[in-house]
Regions:
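Gram-negative (and chloroplast) outer-membrane scaffold detector with strong preference
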Residues: 45-136
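Short glycine/proline- and aromatic-enriched beta-strand/turn motifs that initiate or cap beta-hairpins
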Residues: 19-68, 168-173
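Internal, hydrophobic beta-strand segments that form the core of beta-sheet-rich folds
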Residues: 139-142
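Cleavable N-terminal export/targeting peptides
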Residues: 1-22
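Extracytoplasmic loops and strand-loop junctions of Gram-negative outer membrane beta-barrel proteins
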Residues: 26-29, 106-108, 150-152
Length: 173
């Protein structure tokens, strides 16, 4: 009985603490642009807030636009950190953040070359909260894509600096 009471007490305290820190679930679209390089990234994201900071994780799908030189597609995941500049209680504030994106892109052509990519990204943006539960977050970032595997795409366009505009939207709990 004592263990059950202790379990219920700890569970109640943990749920109460989590209820004080909002979290968000939504979709995200990013469009990395670099010298000779264009890409599309769509994905799902989860973000948890603690006062003026937030931590996010996401799963992404990478695909090349129709007008790109070489075709590719692949999956990735990321983890990120954001810090808010404002203290607006409505949740609409500017932010600055860092994100680490790991992606496995499969380049198409005569042979399929699987490429593991690592991209550190710095971003700035604005987090808008509509009503109590809906959000949208436009942002722009700069990242440098680093290829971990040795194979290269035919024009070496898979490495280098990227300007990364993005937009996410979803539901706040």
């Amino acid at each position: 009985m004592k263990n059950l009471f202790l379990f219920l007490l700890i569970s109640a305290l943990a749920l109460t603490a989590e209820a004080q820190n909002p979290s968000e679930l939504g979709a995200e679209y990013m469009m990395p642009i670099g010298k000779g390089y264009k890409s599309n990234i769509a994905g799902l994201r989860y973000e948890s807030f603690n006062n003026k900071t937030s931590f996010s994780i996401g799963i992404t799908y990478h695909f090349s636009p129709n007008d790109a030189y070489g075709g590719f597609k692949g999956y990735g995941l990321y983890a990120g950190f954001r810090n808010s500049f404002g203290s607006n209680t409505s949740g609409s504030n500017p932010f600055i953040g860092l994100r680490l994106l790991f992606a496995f892109e499969n380049f198409e052509g005569k042979t399929n070359l699987g490429s593991l990519m690592f991209t550190p990204i710095g971003e700035v943006g604005w987090h808008f909260l509509f009503g109590d539960h809906f959000f949208t977050t436009p942002s722009v970032g700069y990242g440098y894509q680093i290829k971990v595997t040795k194979e290269h795409n035919t024009r070496d366009q898979d490495e280098g600096g990227r300007i990364i505009p993005g937009l996410s939207a979803g539901y706040r709990f």
